[in-house]
């Protein structure tokens, strides 16, 4: 597994966990400390930590804009109706598509689909692919 795939999975797991912590508005230092604790508990590979932390910090910093983009792309779906795992995977990939110039949109989408196959329900890979393809189109406008 590539370092970036591992980092994306760690970011997904951290953000999933973060969904269940009420009002976890961390300072950058607190976020890094909480992420380091997460990495120790779940034995996250040191090589992927920097990229994972960048993904997490980016998603949390721009979550409202990311969520609006996902809701616009996921026609007839509110964020509250999307499973927590799918929702956070969409957030990570949407952040990469919209804000990471070094990651082609097609790579972010493919990685998200592959991660969905591993962590999400049977229908999730198709759903994730469709939503992210629409996100890519919206970001190109």
Curated annotation (Swiss-Prot):
Keywords: RNA-binding, Transcription, Transcription antitermination, Transcription regulation
Alphabetical list of Pfam families matching this protein: NusB
SUPFAM superfamilies the record matches: NusB-like
GO MF entry, a single one: RNA binding
GO CC terms, sorted: cytosol
InterPro entries in UniProt: NusB-like_sf, NusB_fam, NusB_RsmB_TIM44
Entry's Gene Ontology BP terms: DNA-templated transcription termination; transcription antitermination
UniProt superkingdom: Bacteria
Function noted in UniProt: Involved in transcription antitermination. Required for transcription of ribosomal RNA (rRNA) genes. Binds specifically to the boxA antiterminator sequence of the ribosomal RNA (rrn) operons.
Family (UniProt): Belongs to the NusB family.
Descriptive protein name: Transcription antitermination protein NusB
Species of the source: Desulfotalea psychrophila (strain LSv54 / DSM 12343)
Lineage: Bacteria, Pseudomonadati, Thermodesulfobacteriota, Desulfobulbia, Desulfobulbales
Gene: nusB
């Amino acid at each position: 597994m590539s370092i970036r795939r591992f980092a994306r999975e760690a970011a997904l797991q951290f953000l999933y966990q973060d969904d269940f912590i009420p009002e976890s508005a961390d300072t950058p230092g607190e976020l890094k400390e909480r992420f380091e604790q997460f990495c120790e508990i779940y034995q996250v590979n040191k090589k992927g930590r920097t990229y994972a932390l960048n993904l997490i910090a980016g998603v949390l910093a721009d979550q409202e804009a990311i969520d609006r983009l996902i809701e616009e792309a996921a026609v007839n779906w509110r964020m509250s109706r999307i499973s927590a795992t799918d929702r956070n995977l969409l957030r990570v990939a949407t952040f990469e598509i919209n804000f990471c110039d070094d990651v082609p949109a097609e790579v972010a989408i493919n990685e998200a689909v592959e991660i969905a196959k591993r962590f999400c329900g049977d229908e999730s890979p198709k759903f994730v692919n469709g939503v992210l393809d629409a996100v890519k189109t919206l970001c190109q406008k």
